[in-house]
Design a protein with these regions (language model features):
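Transmembrane alpha-helical segments of multi-pass small-molecule transport proteins
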Residues: 159-185, 204, 258-270
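Select transmembrane alpha-helical segments in multipass membrane proteins
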Residues: 30-38, 87-91, 122-138, 170-177, ...
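Membrane-interface loop-to-helix entry segments
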Residues: 1, 128-136, 142, 185-212, ...
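N-terminal alpha-helical transmembrane segments of multi-pass membrane transport
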Residues: 1-67, 85, 207, 211
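Transmembrane-helix boundary/entry motifs in multi-pass membrane transporters
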Residues: 18-37, 70-82, 106-138, 160-162, ...
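Membrane-water interface regions at transmembrane-helix termini and the short interhelical loops
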Residues: 5-23, 72-79, 93-104, 153-159, ...
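Membrane-interface interhelical connector segments
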Residues: 232-247, 304-337
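Hydrophobic alpha-helical segments and their helix-loop junctions in multi-pass secondary transporters
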Residues: 2-11, 51, 141-158, 203-241, ...
Length: 337
Protein backbone atom coordinates (compact mmCIF):
# COMPACT_ATOMS: atom_id res chain seq x y z
CA UNK A 1 0.00 0.00 0.00
CA UNK A 2 2.76 2.44 0.96
CA UNK A 3 4.63 1.58 -2.23
CA UNK A 4 1.57 2.41 -4.34
CA UNK A 5 1.19 5.80 -2.65
CA UNK A 6 4.88 6.55 -3.17
CA UNK A 7 4.69 5.65 -6.87
CA UNK A 8 1.54 7.73 -7.37
CA UNK A 9 2.97 10.91 -5.86
CA UNK A 10 6.55 10.55 -7.07
CA UNK A 11 7.91 11.65 -10.45
CA UNK A 12 6.79 8.28 -11.83
CA UNK A 13 3.17 9.27 -11.29
CA UNK A 14 3.29 11.56 -14.34
CA UNK A 15 4.24 8.75 -16.73
CA UNK A 16 1.51 8.13 -19.31
CA UNK A 17 0.67 4.49 -19.98
CA UNK A 18 0.88 4.98 -23.73
CA UNK A 19 2.10 7.62 -26.14
CA UNK A 20 2.66 11.16 -24.88
CA UNK A 21 -0.59 13.11 -25.03
CA UNK A 22 -2.66 9.97 -25.58
CA UNK A 23 -6.16 10.14 -24.07
CA UNK A 24 -7.88 7.33 -22.14
CA UNK A 25 -10.00 5.02 -24.24
CA UNK A 26 -12.75 4.73 -21.60
CA UNK A 27 -14.54 7.21 -19.37
CA UNK A 28 -13.77 7.05 -15.65
CA UNK A 29 -17.06 5.30 -14.88
CA UNK A 30 -16.68 2.65 -17.59
CA UNK A 31 -13.03 2.12 -16.70
CA UNK A 32 -13.86 1.85 -13.00
CA UNK A 33 -16.73 -0.55 -13.68
CA UNK A 34 -14.49 -2.86 -15.68
CA UNK A 35 -11.80 -2.73 -13.02
CA UNK A 36 -14.18 -3.39 -10.12
CA UNK A 37 -15.98 -6.29 -11.79
CA UNK A 38 -12.69 -7.94 -12.74
CA UNK A 39 -11.21 -7.50 -9.30
CA UNK A 40 -13.72 -8.47 -6.63
CA UNK A 41 -17.25 -8.70 -7.96
CA UNK A 42 -17.70 -12.49 -8.01
CA UNK A 43 -17.25 -12.95 -4.25
CA UNK A 44 -18.45 -9.66 -2.93
CA UNK A 45 -22.16 -10.49 -2.60
CA UNK A 46 -21.35 -13.61 -0.62
CA UNK A 47 -18.92 -12.06 1.83
CA UNK A 48 -20.65 -8.68 2.15
CA UNK A 49 -23.72 -10.31 3.66
CA UNK A 50 -22.06 -13.03 5.72
CA UNK A 51 -18.46 -12.32 6.70
CA UNK A 52 -19.31 -10.54 9.94
CA UNK A 53 -21.22 -13.66 11.10
CA UNK A 54 -18.10 -15.80 10.76
CA UNK A 55 -16.09 -13.23 12.70
CA UNK A 56 -18.71 -12.85 15.42
CA UNK A 57 -18.03 -16.31 16.86
CA UNK A 58 -14.25 -16.00 16.63
CA UNK A 59 -12.40 -15.75 19.97
CA UNK A 60 -10.19 -12.96 18.62
CA UNK A 61 -13.20 -10.65 18.18
CA UNK A 62 -14.24 -11.37 21.76
CA UNK A 63 -10.71 -10.51 22.92
CA UNK A 64 -10.82 -7.16 21.13
CA UNK A 65 -14.25 -6.10 22.34
CA UNK A 66 -17.86 -6.35 21.25
CA UNK A 67 -19.28 -7.82 18.05
CA UNK A 68 -20.91 -4.47 17.32
CA UNK A 69 -17.54 -2.72 17.44
CA UNK A 70 -15.27 -5.18 15.61
CA UNK A 71 -17.21 -7.70 13.50
CA UNK A 72 -17.82 -5.06 10.83
CA UNK A 73 -14.24 -3.73 10.88
CA UNK A 74 -12.33 -6.74 9.60
CA UNK A 75 -14.32 -7.12 6.35
CA UNK A 76 -13.42 -3.51 5.48
CA UNK A 77 -9.79 -4.18 6.34
CA UNK A 78 -9.48 -7.47 4.46
CA UNK A 79 -11.16 -6.28 1.25
CA UNK A 80 -10.05 -2.69 0.77
CA UNK A 81 -6.62 -1.06 0.71
CA UNK A 82 -4.28 -4.05 0.83
CA UNK A 83 -5.82 -6.20 -1.95
CA UNK A 84 -6.25 -3.23 -4.25
CA UNK A 85 -2.67 -2.13 -3.58
CA UNK A 86 -1.52 -5.57 -4.78
CA UNK A 87 -3.50 -5.13 -7.98
CA UNK A 88 -2.65 -1.51 -8.70
CA UNK A 89 1.12 -1.64 -8.21
CA UNK A 90 1.32 -4.55 -10.64
CA UNK A 91 -1.26 -2.97 -12.97
CA UNK A 92 0.86 0.12 -13.61
CA UNK A 93 3.94 -2.07 -14.10
CA UNK A 94 2.13 -4.24 -16.64
CA UNK A 95 0.52 -1.18 -18.23
CA UNK A 96 3.98 0.35 -18.69
CA UNK A 97 5.22 -2.90 -20.22
CA UNK A 98 2.26 -3.15 -22.62
CA UNK A 99 1.70 0.45 -23.66
CA UNK A 100 5.12 2.09 -23.28
CA UNK A 101 7.61 -0.71 -23.89
CA UNK A 102 5.20 -2.29 -26.43
CA UNK A 103 5.73 -5.80 -25.11
CA UNK A 104 2.35 -7.32 -25.88
CA UNK A 105 2.97 -10.83 -24.57
CA UNK A 106 0.83 -10.87 -21.43
CA UNK A 107 2.90 -13.38 -19.50
CA UNK A 108 4.56 -13.15 -16.13
CA UNK A 109 7.78 -14.36 -17.66
CA UNK A 110 7.72 -11.35 -19.98
CA UNK A 111 7.49 -9.05 -16.97
CA UNK A 112 10.62 -10.78 -15.63
CA UNK A 113 12.62 -10.28 -18.84
CA UNK A 114 14.80 -7.48 -17.38
CA UNK A 115 15.92 -9.99 -14.72
CA UNK A 116 15.94 -13.23 -16.72
CA UNK A 117 17.23 -11.89 -20.02
CA UNK A 118 17.58 -14.66 -22.60
CA UNK A 119 16.30 -17.20 -20.07
CA UNK A 120 12.83 -15.66 -20.33
CA UNK A 121 12.19 -17.83 -23.41
CA UNK A 122 13.74 -20.93 -21.85
CA UNK A 123 12.82 -23.21 -18.96
CA UNK A 124 12.98 -20.55 -16.17
CA UNK A 125 10.42 -18.44 -18.03
CA UNK A 126 8.25 -21.48 -18.74
CA UNK A 127 8.27 -22.47 -15.08
CA UNK A 128 7.14 -18.96 -14.09
CA UNK A 129 4.27 -19.10 -16.62
CA UNK A 130 3.30 -22.60 -15.48
CA UNK A 131 3.12 -21.48 -11.85
CA UNK A 132 1.01 -18.50 -12.92
CA UNK A 133 -1.43 -20.83 -14.71
CA UNK A 134 -1.76 -23.05 -11.64
CA UNK A 135 -2.32 -19.98 -9.47
CA UNK A 136 -5.01 -18.71 -11.83
CA UNK A 137 -6.77 -22.09 -11.81
CA UNK A 138 -6.69 -22.12 -8.00
CA UNK A 139 -8.09 -18.59 -7.81
CA UNK A 140 -10.83 -19.30 -10.34
CA UNK A 141 -11.82 -22.52 -8.57
CA UNK A 142 -12.00 -20.71 -5.22
CA UNK A 143 -14.12 -17.90 -6.66
CA UNK A 144 -16.59 -20.21 -8.36
CA UNK A 145 -16.78 -22.48 -5.31
CA UNK A 146 -17.99 -19.48 -3.30
CA UNK A 147 -20.19 -17.59 -5.77
CA UNK A 148 -21.84 -20.40 -7.76
CA UNK A 149 -23.45 -22.30 -4.82
CA UNK A 150 -24.93 -19.02 -3.56
CA UNK A 151 -26.51 -18.32 -6.95
CA UNK A 152 -27.77 -21.91 -7.11
CA UNK A 153 -29.35 -21.65 -3.65
CA UNK A 154 -31.08 -18.37 -4.53
CA UNK A 155 -32.43 -19.76 -7.82
CA UNK A 156 -33.55 -22.99 -6.14
CA UNK A 157 -35.40 -21.11 -3.42
CA UNK A 158 -36.83 -18.40 -5.69
CA UNK A 159 -38.30 -20.75 -8.28
CA UNK A 160 -39.00 -23.65 -5.86
CA UNK A 161 -36.95 -26.04 -7.97
CA UNK A 162 -36.74 -29.68 -6.92
CA UNK A 163 -33.59 -30.50 -8.89
CA UNK A 164 -30.34 -30.85 -6.99
CA UNK A 165 -28.13 -27.87 -6.24
CA UNK A 166 -25.30 -29.60 -8.14
CA UNK A 167 -27.34 -29.62 -11.35
CA UNK A 168 -28.11 -25.92 -10.95
CA UNK A 169 -24.41 -25.24 -10.31
CA UNK A 170 -23.52 -26.92 -13.60
CA UNK A 171 -26.13 -24.90 -15.52
CA UNK A 172 -24.84 -21.65 -13.96
CA UNK A 173 -21.26 -22.50 -14.92
CA UNK A 174 -22.31 -23.26 -18.50
CA UNK A 175 -24.21 -19.96 -18.78
CA UNK A 176 -21.23 -18.13 -17.27
CA UNK A 177 -18.91 -19.67 -19.86
CA UNK A 178 -21.29 -18.67 -22.68
CA UNK A 179 -21.55 -15.07 -21.47
CA UNK A 180 -17.79 -14.90 -20.93
CA UNK A 181 -17.10 -16.27 -24.42
CA UNK A 182 -19.56 -13.82 -25.98
CA UNK A 183 -17.87 -10.91 -24.19
CA UNK A 184 -14.42 -12.03 -25.31
CA UNK A 185 -15.53 -12.40 -28.93
CA UNK A 186 -16.62 -8.76 -28.84
CA UNK A 187 -13.33 -7.67 -27.22
CA UNK A 188 -13.10 -4.94 -24.62
CA UNK A 189 -16.28 -3.38 -25.99
CA UNK A 190 -18.26 -6.45 -24.98
CA UNK A 191 -16.55 -6.60 -21.61
CA UNK A 192 -17.27 -2.91 -20.96
CA UNK A 193 -20.97 -3.40 -21.73
CA UNK A 194 -21.19 -6.39 -19.42
CA UNK A 195 -19.32 -4.51 -16.67
CA UNK A 196 -21.65 -1.51 -16.97
CA UNK A 197 -24.71 -3.76 -16.75
CA UNK A 198 -23.32 -5.50 -13.67
CA UNK A 199 -22.39 -2.27 -11.92
CA UNK A 200 -25.86 -0.75 -12.49
CA UNK A 201 -27.53 -3.84 -11.02
CA UNK A 202 -25.05 -3.87 -8.15
CA UNK A 203 -25.54 -0.25 -7.11
CA UNK A 204 -29.27 -0.64 -7.65
CA UNK A 205 -29.23 -3.47 -5.11
CA UNK A 206 -27.25 -1.35 -2.64
CA UNK A 207 -29.65 1.58 -3.03
CA UNK A 208 -32.68 -0.69 -2.56
CA UNK A 209 -31.26 -2.28 0.60
CA UNK A 210 -30.25 1.09 2.06
CA UNK A 211 -33.51 2.90 1.29
CA UNK A 212 -36.08 0.15 1.79
CA UNK A 213 -34.39 -2.37 4.08
CA UNK A 214 -35.43 -0.60 7.27
CA UNK A 215 -31.88 -0.36 8.64
CA UNK A 216 -30.67 2.87 7.01
CA UNK A 217 -29.68 4.69 10.20
CA UNK A 218 -27.91 1.64 11.61
CA UNK A 219 -26.11 1.02 8.30
CA UNK A 220 -24.79 4.58 8.04
CA UNK A 221 -23.79 5.01 11.69
CA UNK A 222 -22.22 1.57 12.11
CA UNK A 223 -20.53 1.87 8.72
CA UNK A 224 -18.90 5.17 9.63
CA UNK A 225 -17.84 3.78 13.01
CA UNK A 226 -16.32 0.65 11.46
CA UNK A 227 -14.54 2.67 8.78
CA UNK A 228 -13.06 5.01 11.39
CA UNK A 229 -11.96 2.09 13.57
CA UNK A 230 -10.31 0.42 10.58
CA UNK A 231 -8.39 3.56 9.62
CA UNK A 232 -7.37 4.24 13.23
CA UNK A 233 -6.06 0.69 13.74
CA UNK A 234 -4.82 -0.03 10.19
CA UNK A 235 -1.16 -0.55 11.10
CA UNK A 236 -2.00 -2.77 14.06
CA UNK A 237 -4.41 -4.87 12.03
CA UNK A 238 -1.83 -5.22 9.25
CA UNK A 239 0.99 -6.39 11.52
CA UNK A 240 -0.92 -8.60 14.00
CA UNK A 241 0.49 -12.15 13.77
CA UNK A 242 -0.82 -13.78 16.98
CA UNK A 243 2.65 -15.14 17.89
CA UNK A 244 1.26 -17.29 20.73
CA UNK A 245 -1.41 -18.73 18.40
CA UNK A 246 -4.11 -18.06 20.99
CA UNK A 247 -6.81 -17.77 18.31
CA UNK A 248 -4.98 -18.27 14.96
CA UNK A 249 -7.12 -15.45 13.59
CA UNK A 250 -4.49 -13.87 11.28
CA UNK A 251 -3.48 -17.30 9.97
CA UNK A 252 -7.08 -18.33 9.29
CA UNK A 253 -8.23 -15.02 7.85
CA UNK A 254 -5.74 -12.23 7.14
CA UNK A 255 -2.96 -14.37 5.66
CA UNK A 256 -5.52 -16.48 3.80
CA UNK A 257 -6.93 -13.35 2.17
CA UNK A 258 -3.49 -12.02 1.29
CA UNK A 259 -2.68 -15.34 -0.38
CA UNK A 260 -5.99 -15.22 -2.24
CA UNK A 261 -5.34 -11.71 -3.56
CA UNK A 262 -1.83 -12.71 -4.60
CA UNK A 263 -3.22 -15.64 -6.58
CA UNK A 264 -5.45 -13.27 -8.54
CA UNK A 265 -2.47 -11.01 -9.17
CA UNK A 266 -1.64 -13.29 -12.10
CA UNK A 267 -4.70 -12.02 -13.98
CA UNK A 268 -6.39 -8.90 -12.58
CA UNK A 269 -3.39 -6.52 -12.89
CA UNK A 270 -2.87 -7.50 -16.53
CA UNK A 271 -6.48 -6.61 -17.28
CA UNK A 272 -6.36 -3.33 -15.34
CA UNK A 273 -3.12 -2.40 -17.08
CA UNK A 274 -4.64 -3.21 -20.47
CA UNK A 275 -7.69 -0.97 -20.02
CA UNK A 276 -5.66 1.89 -18.49
CA UNK A 277 -4.00 2.94 -21.74
CA UNK A 278 -3.80 6.74 -21.95
CA UNK A 279 -3.99 7.27 -18.18
CA UNK A 280 -1.05 8.33 -16.07
CA UNK A 281 0.38 6.11 -13.38
CA UNK A 282 -1.07 8.48 -10.77
CA UNK A 283 -4.54 8.40 -12.35
CA UNK A 284 -4.49 4.62 -12.50
CA UNK A 285 -3.48 4.13 -8.87
CA UNK A 286 -5.63 6.85 -7.30
CA UNK A 287 -8.56 6.15 -9.62
CA UNK A 288 -8.32 2.48 -8.72
CA UNK A 289 -8.48 3.33 -5.04
CA UNK A 290 -11.40 5.71 -5.52
CA UNK A 291 -13.54 3.36 -7.59
CA UNK A 292 -12.27 -0.05 -6.49
CA UNK A 293 -11.85 0.55 -2.77
CA UNK A 294 -14.79 2.96 -2.63
CA UNK A 295 -17.21 0.49 -4.22
CA UNK A 296 -15.93 -2.32 -2.02
CA UNK A 297 -16.35 -0.32 1.18
CA UNK A 298 -19.86 0.77 0.22
CA UNK A 299 -20.84 -2.83 -0.50
CA UNK A 300 -19.66 -4.16 2.86
CA UNK A 301 -21.02 -1.19 4.77
CA UNK A 302 -24.50 -1.45 3.23
CA UNK A 303 -25.01 -5.21 2.87
CA UNK A 304 -22.99 -6.29 5.89
CA UNK A 305 -24.51 -3.77 8.28
CA UNK A 306 -27.98 -4.50 6.93
CA UNK A 307 -27.73 -8.14 8.00
CA UNK A 308 -25.93 -7.21 11.24
CA UNK A 309 -28.65 -4.65 11.96
CA UNK A 310 -31.30 -7.36 11.70
CA UNK A 311 -29.27 -9.38 14.21
CA UNK A 312 -28.67 -6.55 16.66
CA UNK A 313 -32.29 -5.40 16.62
CA UNK A 314 -33.59 -8.91 17.33
CA UNK A 315 -35.36 -9.28 13.98
CA UNK A 316 -33.34 -12.39 13.12
CA UNK A 317 -30.66 -14.55 14.73
CA UNK A 318 -28.19 -15.32 11.97
CA UNK A 319 -25.44 -16.20 14.43
CA UNK A 320 -27.53 -18.98 15.96
CA UNK A 321 -28.63 -20.14 12.50
CA UNK A 322 -25.04 -20.38 11.30
CA UNK A 323 -23.88 -22.09 14.51
CA UNK A 324 -26.65 -24.67 14.12
CA UNK A 325 -26.53 -25.41 10.39
CA UNK A 326 -23.19 -24.07 9.14
CA UNK A 327 -25.00 -23.22 5.90
CA UNK A 328 -23.93 -19.72 4.86
CA UNK A 329 -25.76 -19.98 1.54
CA UNK A 330 -29.11 -20.67 3.19
CA UNK A 331 -28.43 -17.91 5.71
CA UNK A 332 -27.78 -15.37 2.94
CA UNK A 333 -31.02 -16.38 1.22
CA UNK A 334 -32.85 -15.75 4.52
CA UNK A 335 -31.14 -12.33 4.79
CA UNK A 336 -32.25 -11.40 1.28
CA UNK A 337 -35.81 -12.50 2.02
Amino acid sequence: FLLSIYIAFSKYGDIVLGEKGEKPRYSFFVWGSMMFTCGLAADILFYSFSEWVMYASDPHIKEMGSIQQWAGVYPLFHWSLIPWSFYLVLAVAFGFMLHVRKRNRQKYSEACRPLLGKYTDKWPGRIIDLLAVFALLAGTATTFSVATPLMATIIQDLFHLTVSRTAINIVILIITCIVYTYSLLHGFKGISRLANLCIYFFFGLLAFVLLFGGQARYIIETGLNSLGTMVENFIGLSTFTDPLRSTNFPQNWTIYYWAYWMVWCVAAPFFIGSISKGRTVRQTILGGYVFGVGSTLISFIVLGNYSMGLQMHGIADFMAQYAKTGDLYGMIVDIIK
